[in-house]
Amino acid sequence: MSAVRENGVIVAIDGPSGAGKSSLTKLLAKRLGYIHIDTGAMFRAVALSAQRAGIKSDDDAGLAELCRGLEIAFARDGETCRVLANGEDVSTKIRTEEIGLLTSTISARKPVRQALLEMQRKMGAKGGVILEGRDIGTVVFPDAEVKFFLSASAEERGRRRYLELAARGESATLEETIAKVIQRDRQDEGREHAPLKQAQDAVPIDSTSLTIEQVLELMESTVKERLAQGDKG
């Protein structure tokens, strides 16, 4: 087994909406001392910027120009990580249901995927990073040393999302939230460019009946095992 990269390994966590990727990535990054790159937040930042600029989701030329002038960064703020779009903190603004659905459409556009692909590869090239999204292990970093595919039933993912929305004071019914999760799955799995699918060498984890701590321990032990193999290589 070859040695790991300059700063460690690249960990790719893929899976559908609501599978718990963001929460687990943050916790795993903290335990390993790695940098968390939230690729979903990057696409959401593009969607928010496009909405503000009045750029339609099928306007490839407009989206390409938007991405050229958009700088996305992550800033650690204590236990949380803020998402910045051209210096503005958009961490909360990008998490609405409206932006979530728009993101699924815009993220399927080739100019957007290409622009963010380049950003993500630059951010993670030296290792010591955890990236989560829908095509990290298949497209962004197919050579990532550790890959996970995190899933859960649509009902469980909808329930988790419903609780998140309720905690933020957003009005939605459980049935509506589950329906939107299923709709998002169809969009993500059916898009032309980089559809959601499990990498052949990814470790599959169904978190439907597992606690966050159980999933976290499984992920941490897998990464540490890979690091140990690299040290011997």
Curated annotation (Swiss-Prot):
UniProt keyword list: ATP-binding, Cytoplasm, Kinase, Nucleotide-binding, Transferase
Reaction catalysis annotation: CMP + ATP = CDP + ADP; dCMP + ATP = dCDP + ADP
Pfam families for this protein: Cytidylate_kin
GO biological process: nucleobase-containing small molecule interconversion; pyrimidine nucleotide metabolic process
InterPro entries: Cytidylate_kin (IPR003136), Cytidylate_kinase_dom (IPR011994), P-loop_NTPase (IPR027417)
Top-level taxon of the source organism: Bacteria
Enzyme Commission no: 2.7.4.25
Single GO term (MF): ATP binding
Binding annotation for ATP: 15-23
Cell compartments where the protein resides: Cytoplasm
Any one Gene Ontology cellular component term annotated for this protein: cytosol
Enzyme class: transferase
NCBIfam families from the UniProt entry: cmk
Annotated HAMAP family: Cytidyl_kinase_type1
Family assignment from sequence similarity: Belongs to the cytidylate kinase family. Type 1 subfamily.
Protein name: Cytidylate kinase
Source species: Citrifermentans bemidjiense (strain ATCC BAA-1014 / DSM 16622 / JCM 12645 / Bem)
Lineage: Bacteria, Pseudomonadati, Thermodesulfobacteriota, Desulfuromonadia, Geobacterales
